[in-house]
Design a protein with these regions (language model features):
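Beta-strand->loop->alpha-helix junctions that form or flank phosphate-binding loops
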Residues: 78-81, 208-209, 223-243, 264-269, ...
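C-terminal helical cap/extension that packs against the catalytic core
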Residues: 211-229, 246-249, 319-322, 328, ...
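ATP-dependent carboxylate-amine ligase catalytic core
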Residues: 8, 36-44, 70-166, 182-184, ...
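Extended acidic/charged loop-beta regions that coordinate divalent cations
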Residues: 137-183, 216-261
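Short glycine/serine- and small hydrophobic-enriched flexible loop segments
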Residues: 140-143, 280-287, 439
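Short functional linear segments
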Residues: 1-53, 60-73, 78-80, 117-125
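Nucleotide phosphate-binding/pyrophosphate-handling subdomain across enzymes
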Residues: 45, 149-152, 161-172, 176-180, ...
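A glycine-rich beta-strand to alpha-helix segment
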Residues: 410-442
Length: 446
């Protein structure tokens, strides 16, 4: 059955690629709007976060997606280009669209694509392009899921990009520079004006630091549309960036409040800036930028922007690994990754969870790789009490393989003693605890 869907999906992809390539976009919206109209305007069935810029769009989109999902929203993401397969461009619930869903939704929209192609031919206009058809397909997939919010990355520019048939609740601008001058215009101001077209009446706008002339263009578009503008470096502040192994810790200040010590599992100042505007964009989407969001949820969302099963080695002798797995599925992936990547004479797991997590399922997944558990609790009001959690772990792993400590620092110290210089320490179970551990270890407290 899977092979059958793969073959059908390949046929869909071939049909899309048979259209005018995305390197030759048509500066128009009417055909995409017409196709969406025939389908009942699926792009109006959910919230919209729209992202344009010259660099960092996909990273920012993925972070926003992770943050929205951490807040319990079902999200869809459209990005480009893809690495291996077109399915990657349409993401629902953090996963690329399945071949089955891709085929089903394409079959639903294909008659309407043909109808629009026929109308365009009658007017001596080119048929729907690859990207126009893909945009319509993405909207159909999101409506079919259905999602609560779609995060859309423009293909090129903004004003006449096919994704712009959607009306942004939040418009996000990553750094804008000189690009595609043959399509977007010969000057930075021209390019900024084209990109500013994603700003709609009553949109909320968040932007990375920009050159002065770009800020002026964005400010003018915001005034015209009565859209509030938040600028990183003016309204949003990265007050600290602390590099760490496999990532960095950032502090963000904005009108609603501050977020201290957020763990971003990506390297580079540009990724810290992307994370800051992603947090600001989600704040704007959920509460108009007036209400500070729960730190633990923000921390969880940023941590999930990494690749599934990613391991972060934060110290050697003994090797200390942190991983944000906080459900059984993630713990199973983590267990497999540890077994395939490391060969420790002994591995000690420092374990703590929030109260709403499946602790038993996580421990069962980690049990095959753990020689010893040190149970603790994250520094969070939502943490499961350490003694209660220790009872659960002891039932599963046995009293000879379980200890507990009330504070994470003490738990890590005990784990290091148990592991010995050649062993390994794995800190997992809670995103919040991983961030706390990164901060402790970066400060050299262990």
């Amino acid at each position: 059955m899977c092979e059958q869907f793969r073959e059908q999906a390949d046929a869909v992809i071939d049909a899309l690629y048979a259209r005018i390539g995305e390197g030759s976009p048509q500066p128009r919206l009417a055909p995409t709007r017409r196709a969406c109209e025939l389908l009942g305007d699926p792009q109006r069935m959910h919230g919209i976060v729209h992202i344009t810029g010259s660099n960092g769009k996909t990273s920012t989109a993925r972070m926003i997606d992770s943050l929205l999902r951490a807040h319990g929203l079902r999200s869809g993401v459209m990005t480009s280009p893809h690495l291996n397969r077109l399915n990657e461009r349409i993401v629902i619930d953090g996963e690329p669209i399945s071949d089955e869903a891709l085929v089903a939704n394409y079959n639903d929209i294909e008659p309407f694509l043909v109808m629009v192609d026929t109308e365009l031919a009658a007017s001596d206009e080119p048929a729907l392009t690859f990207f126009e058809a893909l945009t319509v397909l993405a909207f159909a997939c999101f409506a079919d899921a259905p999602v609560d919010v779609a995060v859309l990355e423009v293909g090129m520019g903004g004003e006449w990009d096919s994704t712009n048939v959607a009306n942004a609740d939040v418009a996000v601008f990553t750094p804008i520079g000189m690009e595609h001058v043959e399509k977007l215009g010969p000057t930075l101001i021209d390019i900024a004006r084209t990109k500013s077209g994603i700003i709609k009446p009553a949109s909320r706008v968040v932007t990375s630091p920009q050159q002065a002339e770009v800020i002026e263009v964005l400010r003018g578009a915001c005034e015209l549309n009565e859209a509030p503008l938040s600028v990183l470096g003016r309204d949003i502040h990265l007050t600290a960036i602390t590099p760490g192994v496999g990532g960095q810790l950032i502090d963000i200040e904005m009108h609603s409040g501050s977020y201290w010590g957020l763990a971003v599992p990506l390297l580079g100042t540009h990724q810290a800036e992307n994370a800051a505007i992603a947090v600001a964009a989600v704040e704007q989407f959920l509460g108009g930028g007036e209400h500070r969001l729960e730190r633990e949820v923000i921390e969880e969302g940023l941590a999930q922007s990494t690749s599934p099963g990613r391991l972060q080695v934060v110290r050697i002798q003994p090797t200390i690994i942190v991983d944000a797995a906080h459900n059984p599925h993630g713990a199973e992936a983590l267990s497999r990754a540890v077994m395939s990547s490391f060969q420790f004479p002994s591995l000690v797991v420092v374990f703590g969870v929030l109260s709403d997590k499946d602790a038993r399922g996580i421990v069962e997944a980690l049990d095959p790789i753990a020689d010893y558990f040190v149970v603790t609790q994250p520094h969070s009001e939502r943490a499961r009490p350490v003694e209660d959690l220790a009872d659960t772990v002891t039932q599963l792993a046995g009293p000879d393989r379980t200890s507990w400590r009330g504070g994470l620092s003490d738990a890590i110290e005990l784990a290091i003693e148990q592991a010995g210089p050649d062993g390994g320490v794995l800190i997992t179970g809670s995103v919040a605890m991983v961030g706390e551990a990164m901060e402790l270890l970066s400060e050299g407290e262990q």
